[in-house]
């Protein structure tokens, strides 16, 4: 149903077009990978971005949030875009505040906050491979520009034979253009 039209990667650094670049106080190299898709059934196009912000660098997370906003606008323009990832930041933290700041024309919407139905599942998204979630706050998000309707939002916390698939719970949103 989805036809990939284009894809690229940029680095979360002061030189985002330089492969392997790392800046600010980042512990390791971090990226954003994006793709443009055509929905062959609906005839629409949209962009999907995925990222993983640094786990150590507070400055790196802040600057990555700013860079992400500017690059999403530069790449996607007014075309619908969904941005997913591990932002290593809780809702009250500066990177998420930057991303969702309604006073900034580039801001994105947190799908959990604007969903048409109540969120399903635990609030926290990091589990550390342990049976109890470590935090009651998310660090993994699905953001969108203003082109989508959010029908459902969930954090999926099931295990298989007592084992977690990841140290993070899956975050799911049902979106409609």
Which residues does each PLM region occupy?
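Internal, well-ordered alpha-helical segments in soluble enzyme and binding-protein domains
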Residues: 31-33, 64, 68
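The start of beta-strands in P-loop NTPase/AAA+ ATPase cores
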Residues: 45-47, 81
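Metal-dependent phosphoester-hydrolase catalytic domains
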Residues: 2-7, 59, 63, 70-81, ...
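Conserved catalytic scaffold of divalent metal-dependent phosphoesterases
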Residues: 36-39, 47-57
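Conserved hydrophobic/aromatic beta-strand scaffold that supports enzyme active sites
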Residues: 32-36, 50, 141-142, 170-172
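Active-site metal-binding loops of divalent metal-dependent hydrolases
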Residues: 51-53, 86-87, 169
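Structured beta-strand-rich core segments of catalytic domains in phosphoester-bond hydrolases
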Residues: 1-45, 155
